[in-house]
Amino acid sequence: MGLPPLSKIPLILRPQAWLHRRHYGEVLSPIRWWGRIPFIFYLVSMFVGWLERKRSPLDPVVRSLVSARIAQMCLCEFCVDITSMKVAERTGSSDKLLAVADWRQSPLFSDEERLALEYAEAASVTPPTVDDALRTRLAAHFDAQALTELTALIGLQNLSARFNSAMDIPAQGLCRIPEKRS
């Protein structure tokens, strides 16, 4: 049995819980584990907010796909759930979401998305397998600001997904994908 979630959200995190309810309709589960260390929860939340800002040099779909792939790699149920919701919202369908695990074989992804997903996978394995050839292709496609933010996003998603997976934080049903009818 893992560490149980907090039954009561700390007072200092209640404004964040209110924002969750406002945006998602419910409080997101990780606050009940991260809430044991509110300062770090706020730092992670601010980091997420910065990377998800409207003026980010990274396309929102690219950010969502990268996060979804890392969530899958880390076997984080909660992260797969929330990133799936974001991919579906940002692409307007579930097509890319359903194909992200097999992005290499799918014709649905742009060159930019493929490069970002390749980098996310290479940077997320232990040890990372980012080589000079990949760095050269990344530098040819992304400017320094975008590449730095992409790398930060990969690092942050790994932190979040690994924490949530290790704590066994469950999915919340944020992204319900309808089953295909035969």
Swiss-Prot record:
Molecular function terms, GO-annotated: peroxiredoxin activity
InterPro entries: AhpD-like, CMD-like
Gene3D superfamilies: AhpD-like
Family per record: To M.tuberculosis Rv2313c.
Protein name: Uncharacterized protein YnjA
